[in-house]
Design a protein with these regions (language model features):
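Conserved, structured core segments of small domains
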Residues: 2-118
Length: 118
């Protein structure tokens, strides 16, 4: 078994944030959702958030984030209206290695502030 990465494949170190919803999130989320979604869209456009979404049962949300370290990744959640207003009660961050095409991973000049280098 080889550790060699096949041609056309790149490995990008990123972070996964899992944010746990409060028990009353079904009631509190709607009033904050437009602000939350606008921010996520802006972070996606900036290349900081790669993917984001919630589990249908509102147990938690997942975000895939480019950041220089775990603290910077966690700041993405800390700065979100959902965590500030109690829609999320906790956010955890874990390092993750994403399999991607080389052209999907920005070079050093393309990195948004606080984003991880490859």
């Amino acid at each position: 078994m080889s550790d060699e990465i096949p041609a056309g494949i790149a490995m990008e170190p990123i972070f996964v944030i899992e944010a746990t919803y409060a028990p009353d999130a079904a009631e509190t989320r709607p009033r904050h959702r437009p602000t939350h979604l606008a921010r996520i869209a802006a972070l996606r456009a900036a290349g900081v958030v790669l993917e984001a979404g919630a589990f249908p049962d509102l147990s938690s949300s997942l975000l895939l984030v480019r950041a220089v370290d775990a603290d910077a990744a966690l700041a993405v959640a800390r700065d979100d209206v959902y965590l500030r207003e109690g829609v999320w009660v906790e956010a955890r961050v874990r390092p993750f290695v994403r399999v991607a095409r080389p052209d999907e991973i920005p070079g050093p000049a393309d990195h948004p502030p606080g984003a991880a280098a490859r």
